[in-house]
């Protein structure tokens, strides 16, 4: 909080009575000039003299962040953060309403998301939330790791089932083996310069998952119940195993000899990839009409295909579980999530 802002109070006049608290609070100061050099100039679509608001999307809502008075059908907002999506809004009787279409602001570039309902395109969706740097790092920790099968606990006769050569781009990675391997014990062993870090591993014989009767691994951090070996077989994509030392391993005992022809592994992840079995609903923003549903789908694999209007802003919701979701648009055939 700052001291009393006399210039703010003098500038507002009687308008404060019809404005959100954020914009007339006399003890709050706008310091965006110290961080953002870009100025936004757009058409407002509202009568001259009225206040137009800008909002950004976060946690399933549009949140107001700036405002300006409409003049000659336009508004100008200095010191606005770039490379974000904004929505022009009006404020009436304590509520915000869209007054136009959302747009991408990148300094001198403005791209309005005006859905073209006459021109539809097919898109393939893999996520509902941005991929942040920490997530890429976690998923990259499996590179160089190997899966080995053996008839004995000591893996003297171990055979390599699969080696992870690159950072996975999805959470659930199903691998069909070139040649089935007969074994009872299977282990995941990390590269020598990495700790063993894995969320899930599942093994299949003739299309059916083989449930292990026991799981063990290299030592973990003492007292840390969040990184235990058993987590690789608990069916929870958010739990994970993490060895204390580099080059660690985690082993499952299948309880019987099985001919393994397929494996599925999940690196440590945020569970915001498309999850088979979950039901999703896709929305696009229709300007003053708000969000418009493009239908629902139940995922049967790790991606969703949708026919959508071109040049639209989207919001994919998981109706089954989870809370983290964010808006995105398509760029060069891929999802782009604008983030702070």
Regions found by a protein language model. Give the residues of each.
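Structural motif
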Residues: 32-53, 57-58, 133-137, 269-271
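Long, contiguous interaction/targeting segments characteristic
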Residues: 1-28, 82-83, 87, 168-171, ...
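Extracellular beta-sheet/turn segments enriched in Thr/Pro/Gly and aliphatic residues
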Residues: 2-3, 9-34, 95-129, 335-340
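Short amphipathic beta-strand segments in non-cytosolic proteins
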Residues: 49-69, 147-154, 158-162, 270, ...
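Short, surface-exposed beta-strand/beta-hairpin micro-motifs centered on an aromatic residue
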Residues: 70-79, 174, 251, 301-306
